[in-house]
Amino acid sequence: MMATWQHHAEARRIEVMQSLRISVIMPVLDEAARIRRQLQELLEVEGLDEILVVDGGSTDDTQQIVRSFAEVSLLVGPPGRGRQMNLGAQAAKGEVLLFLYADVSLPPDAAAWIRRSLTDPAVVGGAFRTWHVPEANMPRAWLGPLLHLADLRSRYSGLPYGDQAMFVRTRVFHALGGFREQDLMEDLEFSRRLRQAGKIVTVPRSVLVSGRRFQARPVYYLVADRVFPLLYRLGVSGSKLAAWYGNPREGGGSKSPSVESQ
């Protein structure tokens, strides 16, 4: 009798977890060149319940392109990835938040893997592995293999980074206070706090990450990808690291938060 009750309770728990709504939050800034393709691909991923694009004040056609998608909600607020993702999280309706950068593409079964991971009540969040892919204009053939050095981090680091399509239970995200609205390393800072809240999993599937940043400054990007996290752990502030990096995320005018639902 007890075994039967436990079986039904476990089945019910799995059923509830599988019904979790997933809200995708995508921070963008001047992404007109790629946002249409990214959203088209994202809409083909089964099992995603909500897509929110949070624009940080683009000066190109990014906002107009996003508005052309009836299934996507557009939010506009001040620039800064942490601020933008927090704004999206406040508006999201799902029980799970999936933070997706504009140069990252999900595998077709991403939602199923997320829900499967969260059937374990001890799991508070997780991320995917990465696989960097070159842009069409890769200048030198030998740069291609170097792209994948960054992919090693996603397999062996215990702390997920933002380009790994991080996901987290909504209640846990808000309990932790969301992302710190700092200039750089907001993803690593949040992951450190998330690890203290419970178990973090790495899904055995890869997201595709554009190699555009690497191709623009290959040596500098490799150094930054390896050294900056270490410097941050040693106490160098996100603002200082952003100044060294050039803080390419920032730009455009600062606007008051607003939301447009299509």
Predicted segments, located by residue:
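Hydrophobic helical membrane-anchoring modules
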Residues: 3-5, 9-17, 192-262
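Short, well-formed alpha-helical segments that are part of the catalytic scaffolds
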Residues: 30-44
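Acidic helix N-cap motif at the loop->helix transition within catalytic regions
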Residues: 33-37, 60-68, 109
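A conserved acidic beta->alpha catalytic loop
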Residues: 41, 55-63, 104
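Conserved donor nucleotide-binding strand/loop of the catalytic core
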Residues: 49, 63-91
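Acidic donor-binding/catalytic loop of UDP-sugar-dependent glycosyltransferases
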Residues: 61, 102-116, 192
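Short aromatic/hydrophobic "clamp" motif used to bind/position activated sugar donors
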Residues: 97
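Conserved donor NDP-sugar-binding/catalytic core segment of glycosyltransferases
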Residues: 109-140
